[in-house]
Amino acid sequence: MQIKPFEDRYRDDLIFMVLEAKDALGRVPHINDDLLEIQKSYFDKGDRFWIAVDENDRVIGCVGYNRIEHTNEAFLHRLYVKASMKHLGIGTALLKEAETAMRQNGIAVARVHLGEPAEQWFESYAFYPKHGYRLYAPRDMLKELKG
């Protein structure tokens, strides 16, 4: 597995992976608008977005973040791992990549919205606390990023 910044040539494979991941969670698959224009939604704003690819250069995971204006905080977005590749450390590796970049860019607090209903997003509610995140609202967690 390799984690690298998103490139447009991976767009369709990324979209397919996200739709598959949502379907595996019992969600009606749809694509969020930001995933259709990652350059505009992330990079053009000074934010970041990564993909994890396997040995065949296929997308198996992703994560991004957007800084919250006029703060030293950012929201994590779109942490997905291909359904057949969960529990192999890919999500943890992607999260660490994002947190490291946030720290390097002066971001002190990472926030994440967990989705609803909680029953469908149960993996998020279990995953983030294992990595130091805590609830600050019914469906939102945060983590203070230490240097």
What are the roles of these predicted feature ranges?
Residues 82-88, 100, 116:
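Active-site acidic-Proline motif in GNAT/NAT acetyltransferases
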Residues 92:
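Residues forming the Rossmann-fold NAD(P)(H) cofactor-binding site
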Residues 86, 111-124, 142-146:
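Conserved beta-strand-loop-alpha-helix junction that forms the acyl-donor binding cleft
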